[in-house]
C-alpha cells in the first residue's frame, strides 16, 4: 500500500469502492483479481463513509479503514483512500471519479463494481456521465450470472469466496 504521491506515475487507475462492512476474503480476492486483470493499473480502494443505497454501516468508518489498512499492507500497487470517509456523508460515485480524475489525470480510469450494482447502475447519480468517464470492471455475484448490460465492461471471474458482508453480519446476529 502506498501514499497518494506514488500514484502519479500510473496512466491507468482503478477505483474499488464499497462499505467493507466488514472486510472479508472476497473483497481481498477482488483486489487480487483486479490487479491481475489490469497489470499496469494502480488500484485505489475507497471505503465509503455511507453507501447511498444501504442502511448505516455496522462498523464505524475509522474501524473499517483500519481493517483495510492492515489487510492491504505490502501491496505496492494498492492505495487506500479516505476521500469519501472525510466527506462524512454518502458520496455519489461520480463525485469520487471526478475527484480522482482531476487529482491524477489518468489516461484510463476503471471502476470495479459487482454484477448486482451493474443491474441498477442507471439509478446512480449522473450514471450517463459516469459511464463516459470510466471503463467498468465487473465481478460476478451469485444470483447475477446473466448480466443485462448493453455497454462494454471487463468481466472479473474466479472469485471463489462468497461475497456478502450482509450475510456475515446476519450470521453474527447484527
From Swiss-Prot:
Keyword Oxidoreductase listed: no
Keywords: ATP-binding, NAD, Nucleotide-binding, Nucleotidyltransferase, Pyridine nucleotide biosynthesis, Transferase
GO biological process: NAD biosynthetic process
Reactions accelerated catalytically: nicotinate beta-D-ribonucleotide + ATP + H(+) = deamido-NAD(+) + diphosphate
Gene3D superfamilies hit by this protein: HUPs (3.40.50.620)
Transferase recorded as keyword: yes
EC number, as in UniProt: 2.7.7.18
Pathway: Cofactor biosynthesis; NAD(+) biosynthesis; deamido-NAD(+) from nicotinate D-ribonucleotide: step 1/1
Disulfide links within the chain: none
GO molecular function: ATP binding; nicotinate-nucleotide adenylyltransferase activity
Pfam families (alphabetical): CTP_transf_like
HAMAP family the UniProt entry points to: NaMN_adenylyltr (MF_00244)
Family as reported in the entry's similarity comment: Belongs to the NadD family.
Function as written in the Swiss-Prot or TrEMBL entry: Catalyzes the reversible adenylation of nicotinate mononucleotide (NaMN) to nicotinic acid adenine dinucleotide (NaAD).
Protein name according to UniProt: Probable nicotinate-nucleotide adenylyltransferase
Species, as recorded: Helicobacter pylori (strain P12)
Lineage per the UniProt record: Bacteria, Pseudomonadati, Campylobacterota, Epsilonproteobacteria, Campylobacterales
Amino acid at each position: 500500500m502506498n501514499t497518494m504521491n506514488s500514484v502519479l506515475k500510473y496512466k491507468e487507475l482503478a477505483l474499488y469502492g464499497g462499505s467493507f462492512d466488514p472486510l472479508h476474503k472476497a473483497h481481498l480476492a477482488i483486489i487480487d483479481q483486479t490487479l491481475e486483470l489490469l497489470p499496469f493499473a494502480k488500484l485505489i480502494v475507497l471505503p465509503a463513509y455511507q453507501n447511498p443505497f444501504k442502511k448505516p454501516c455496522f462498523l464505524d468508518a475509522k474501524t473499517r479503514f483500519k481493517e483495510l489498512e492492515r489487510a492491504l499492507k505490502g501491496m505496492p500497487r494498492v492505495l487506500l483512500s479516505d476521500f469519501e470517509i472525510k466527506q462524512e456523508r454518502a458520496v455519489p460515485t461520480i463525485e469520487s471519479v471526478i475527484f480522482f480524475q482531476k487529482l491524477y489525470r489518468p489516461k484510463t480510469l476503471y471502476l470495479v463494481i459487482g454484477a448486482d450494482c451493474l443491474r441498477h447502475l442507471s439509478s446512480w447519480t449522473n450514471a450517463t456521465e459516469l459511464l463516459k468517464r470510466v471503463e467498468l470492471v465487473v465481478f460476478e455475484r451469485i444470483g447475477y450470472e446473466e448480466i443485462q448490460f448493453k455497454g462494454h465492461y471487463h468481466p472479473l471471474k474466479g472469485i471463489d469466496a462468497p461475497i456478502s458482508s450482509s450475510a456475515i453480519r446476519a450470521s453474527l446476529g447484527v
